[in-house]
C-alpha cells in the first residue's frame, strides 16, 4: 500500500507501518487509526479498501507529512537563523542548539575532528 509517496510494509501492524511516513510518529499513528476505526494490530495487507481510504483521508486533511513537513521544518530553522536568535546562531554554526556541552562530545553536530596545530599533550617527567 502506498501512502503519501511511501510504500508501507504489508507484513507489519498498521500502527507500526504508519510510522514509516515522515511526520507520523507512534502517537499520531494511534490517533489516525482510532479516527478511522481500524484496529492497531491489524496488518496493512489485511486492510479493506474503505479502511485504507479512510486513513488516506485523515492524513491528507489533518496532517503535514513527507516533503511538506520537511519544508516546514527547514523554514522554521531558516526563520530562527534570519532573526538572529541564540538557537538560530547555533544552527548557523552547526553546534548543538539545546544547551548540550561542546568541550567534549557533540561530534554528531560538529562533524569530523579538525586537528589544531601546536596542541600536544605534555608528557610525564
UniProtKB/Swiss-Prot annotation:
Residues 92-125 are annotated as: Disordered. InterPro entries: Rbsml_uS13_C (IPR027437), Ribosomal_uS13 (IPR001892), Ribosomal_uS13-like_H2TH (IPR010979), Ribosomal_uS13_bac-type (IPR019980). One of its GO terms (molecular function) is rRNA binding. One of its GO terms (cellular component) is small ribosomal subunit. Keywords: Ribonucleoprotein, Ribosomal protein, RNA-binding, rRNA-binding, tRNA-binding. It comes from the Bacteria. It holds the Pfam family Ribosomal_S13. Gene3D superfamilies: 1.10.8.50, 30s ribosomal protein s13, domain 2. HAMAP family: Ribosomal_uS13. Part of the 30S ribosomal subunit. Forms a loose heterodimer with protein S19. Forms two bridges to the 50S subunit in the 70S ribosome. Located at the top of the head of the 30S subunit, it contacts several helices of the 16S rRNA. In the 70S ribosome it contacts the 23S rRNA (bridge B1a) and protein L5 of the 50S subunit (bridge B1b), connecting the 2 subunits; these bridges are implicated in subunit movement. Contacts the tRNAs in the A and P-sites. This is Small ribosomal subunit protein uS13. It comes from Chlorobaculum parvum (strain DSM 263 / NCIMB 8327). The gene is rpsM.
Amino acid at each position: 500500500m502506498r501512502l503519501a509517496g511511501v510504500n508501507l510494509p504489508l507484513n507489519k501492524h498498521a500502527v507500526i507501518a504508519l510510522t514509516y511516513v515522515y511526520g507520523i510518529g507512534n502517537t499520531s499513528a494511534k490517533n489516525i487509526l482510532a479516527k478511522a476505526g481500524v484496529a492497531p494490530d491489524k496488518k496493512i495487507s489485511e486492510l479493506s479498501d474503505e479502511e485504507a481510504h479512510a486513513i488516506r483521508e485523515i492524513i491528507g486533511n489533518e496532517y503535514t507529512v513527507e516533503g511538506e513537513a520537511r519544508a516546514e521544518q527547514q523554514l522554521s530553522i531558516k526563520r530562527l537563523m534570519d532573526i538572529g536568535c541564540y538557537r538560530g546562531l547555533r544552527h548557523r554554526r552547526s553546534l548543538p542548539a539545546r544547551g548540550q556541552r561542546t568541550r567534549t562530545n557533540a561530534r554528531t553536530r560538529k562533524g569530523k575532528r579538525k586537528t589544531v596545530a601546536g596542541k600536544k599533550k605534555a608528557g610525564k617527567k
